Amino acid sequence: MSVARHPRPPELVGVPIEEIMQKFVGRFREKKPDWAAFEDAKIEGYKRAQHRFIGAGGSGKHGDPTVIPAKNFTLSIMYVEPGQGNAAHTHEVEEVFFVLQGFLDVFVEDETGKRLTTRLGPWECISCPVGVIHGYQNDSLGPVYFQVMLGRGKPETMGYADDELYKHRDAHLKAV
């Protein structure tokens, strides 16, 4: 007989494992790319698709019924075509970019505009600390797929470094 060494959270006490398996498995083939997941994704140069698996990530779309419920972190897969990326931003939690396929140019930036960039390939990552301006651009010849994790179950939407983007950072949520 197996012994669970840690207690289940209250909402899973007594729930059959068949139901747990159904609720906590996410399959890429069942995910629809969300090309409007972020406010900056409306702008040429920042177009990308989010595939949400665990929670909403930095999109703010916390009511998505197709995702695995998030408690302490989120996990998404991003698809970015050549010449696209995202706007410089910060988060109130750590954010990780982990490249699965293709190449991604990631950057960190200070408040004076000084920017350092490095290229990540498959199975390489960057962990972006809280409050550090960061972002990415696909400057390669092919598309990139990468995993994004945020260190909170319901993080805030992106804290864009650009004042105008920041003022309207939640506008994409009202359009839904």
Question: In which residue ranges do the predicted regions lie?
Answer:
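A short, N-terminal "cap"/entry segment at the start of jelly-roll beta-barrel domains
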Residues: 1-71, 164-176
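Conserved short histidine dyad/triad with adjacent acidic residue
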Residues: 56-63, 76-91, 130
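Short, solvent-exposed loop/turn segments that connect beta-strands within catalytic domains
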Residues: 66, 111-115, 142
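Short, conserved beta-strand element in jelly-roll/cupin
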Residues: 72, 77-82, 90-110, 149-152
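A structural connector/turn signal
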Residues: 75, 85, 94, 115, ...
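Short beta-strand His + acidic residue motifs that chelate non-heme Fe in jelly-roll/DSBH
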Residues: 86-89, 106-107, 128, 134-140, ...
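A short hydrophobic beta-strand segment most commonly corresponding to one strand
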Residues: 96-98, 127, 141-160
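Short acidic-glycine-tyrosine-enriched beta hairpin
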Residues: 110-130
